[in-house]
């Protein structure tokens, strides 16, 4: 008996929009890429339009197009979301690190812990934590969210307080 040739379709990242921002990663001019199909569905989310599986494919070719368009104006690329496909997020981060070694890479995850499919070697910054309205965003001292800088030894330095007004 011959079995049918079944190919598994990998999760494909899609993005809805992107833009240059100055507040997502301290001391960086960041191209923030908003990834759709967010599984977190945080109550009070300011980006609920990212819950649906919509947008354009986000792959190595699209990252290269972004770098060609914005490269001299940015120092960091931050993938905003992608919790439904952390392996693909990790793959894009690895690509950015290899193809554009001077470019910093960040990831904003809505999960409380990093996926085991994430290799910190591929990131300079990672944010973890769902948005919980009564605790506030990163700029609030009461937030549950944390932004970490990945150090050379792959340990994490909590830099969340950099968002707080003195």
Identify what each model region corresponds to.
Residues 52-64, 84-121, 125:
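Canonical radical SAM enzyme core domain
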Residues 42-50, 71-75:
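Short, basic/glycine-rich phosphate-binding loops at helix/coil junctions
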Residues 76-78, 89, 95, 151:
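Flavin-dependent oxidoreductase catalytic cores
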Residues 120-166:
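Classical nucleotidyltransferase
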Residues 66-85:
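Short Fe-S-cluster ligation motifs
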Residues 34, 76-81, 106-108:
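Short, conserved beta-strand edge motifs with alternating hydrophobic and charged residues
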Residues 50, 82, 130-131:
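Flexible loop residues that form catalytic
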Residues 2-34, 39, 47-52, 166:
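N-terminal [4Fe-4S]-dependent radical SAM core
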């Amino acid at each position: 008996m011959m079995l049918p040739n079944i190919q598994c379709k990998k999760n494909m990242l899609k993005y809805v929009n992107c833009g240059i921002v100055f507040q997502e990663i301290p001391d960086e001019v960041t191209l923030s890429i908003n990834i759709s199909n967010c599984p977190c569905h945080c109550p009070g989310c300011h980006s609920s339009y990212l819950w649906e599986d919509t947008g354009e494919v986000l792959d190595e070719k699209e990252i290269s197009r972004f770098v060609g368009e914005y490269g001299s104006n940015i120092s960091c690329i931050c993938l905003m979301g992608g919790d439904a496909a952390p392996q693909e997020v990790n793959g894009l981060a690895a690509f950015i690190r290899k193809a554009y070694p001077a470019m910093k890479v960040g990831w904003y995850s809505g999960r409380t812990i990093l996926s085991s499919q994430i290799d910190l070697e591929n990131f300079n910054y990672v944010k973890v934590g769902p948005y919980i309205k009564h605790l506030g965003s990163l700029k609030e001292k009461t937030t549950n969210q944390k932004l970490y800088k990945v150090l050379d030894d792959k340990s994490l330095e909590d830099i969340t307080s950099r968002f707080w007004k003195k």
